[in-house]
Amino acid sequence: MNMKYDLVIVGGGPAGLAAAVEAKKNGIDNILVIERAKELGGILQQCIHNGFGLHEFKEELTGPEYAQRFMDQLFELNIEYKLDTMVLGISENKIVQAINSVDGYMIIEAKSIILTMGCRERTRGAIAIPGDRPAGIFTAGAAQRYINIEGYMVGKRVVILGSGDIGLIMARRLTLEGAKVLAVAELMPFSGGLMRNIVQCLHDYNIPLYLSHTVVDIIGKDRVEKVIIAKVDENKKAIPGTEIEYECDTLLLSVGLIPENDISRATGIKIDPRTNGPIVNELMETSIPGIFASGNVVHVHDLVDFVSIESRKAGKSAAKYIKGEVTDGEYIEVQIGNGIGYTVPQKFRMENIEKNLELSMRVRQIFKNVKIVVKSNDFVIHSVKKNHMAPGEMEKITLSKTVLGKIDANKIVVEVVEEDK
């Protein structure tokens, strides 16, 4: 079956919904959202805890409530969507191959495409934990789905490896459901989650967090029987004699998220090795003109509100591209300096910036009383004081047109400096 659309959006989660609604509001009528699951909303449907929407709606919502607000807008604007539909591939000339049980094999021609596929969890295999291979080992997201959607309890005595936000939230969720969470072990000397989640999910329930610890052995024949954790040195190697043994039936893994870019790579889109997502410009456009990306497929966000904000930018940019309103120009590269892990966007053109440019970034380690500075030719054009920064919390800085006007090179450098410098 052959089809033609102005805009095709791959992924019907929070990023795809926000992008679709914004593109429609900017004059694009012929839009198709493709979602591989049986319902729209993405991961939010299983995030039944509150804490969503504080930035976007100025009120606290659960995940399904947040998703429903955008779904209602999608329905109101009569934006077409296909569920249970798998995208098989995308070509450089913006032809999408997809398949489902109703329409069969589809070839969809698009004037523009937005990639909003989100991210996936790292598994046990990805981090090579030693030990037996019994039942009772889950990623935190899989456990969340079992409990919140399928209605299955995953275990009674639980150890969690990794202190990402999903792991922290599941520590609380399991406790509320009657399980005993014995410990959360984190390989790094700092938590990978938001401080508010550490307080609300661990401290409030007296769940111990062991920093610089990892799982060194899993023991169990049919089901997990014991998990052994140990302290690690600065080279992340276990220190003999520091082992702690837990009798438990379940191990949850919250060991990082990876942007879902198999399709992006196959299409030939350039990927940033630091984010594992596409390299994007000021319009959230990838290395292939007319193909945009936003949300967790680009870089992992802390809050869904920020995913929505970024995706609205992608939706508006795709509308501009379709209408021929994008101006080409010389790219200015955003390079990372001391302490910065990555920035998004990685490059920009002055011609397409309306008011200001927002840079999202993560730092490599914990910093206190420092400044984020932006330099052009070693000259500081912008600086922001920061009392506390951690890799688990995304930082944002806004560069105004006035600041951008001071750039006199084809690159800027973003770095962390001590306060007195």
PLM regions with names:
Residues 1-10, 68-157, 233-241, 252, ...:
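FAD-binding core/adjacent interface of flavoenzyme oxidoreductases
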Residues 360, 392-403:
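Exposed aromatic-hydrophobic patches
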Residues 105-106, 115-209, 214-223, 290, ...:
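Predominantly flavin-linked oxidoreductase catalytic cores and closely associated redox partners
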Residues 115, 137-147, 250-301:
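FAD-site-proximal beta/loop scaffold in flavoenzymes
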Residues 372-374, 402-421:
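Short, aromatic- and glycine-rich surface loops/edge beta-strands on solvent-exposed regions
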Residues 5-69, 73, 145, 154-200:
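Beta1-alpha1 glycine-rich phosphate/pyrophosphate-binding loop at the start
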Residues 305-306, 313, 317-384:
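Mid-to-C-terminal Rossmann-like scaffold of FAD/NAD(P)H-dependent oxidoreductases
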Residues 69, 74-91, 96-98, 175-262, ...:
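A Rossmann-like FAD-binding core segment of flavoenzymes
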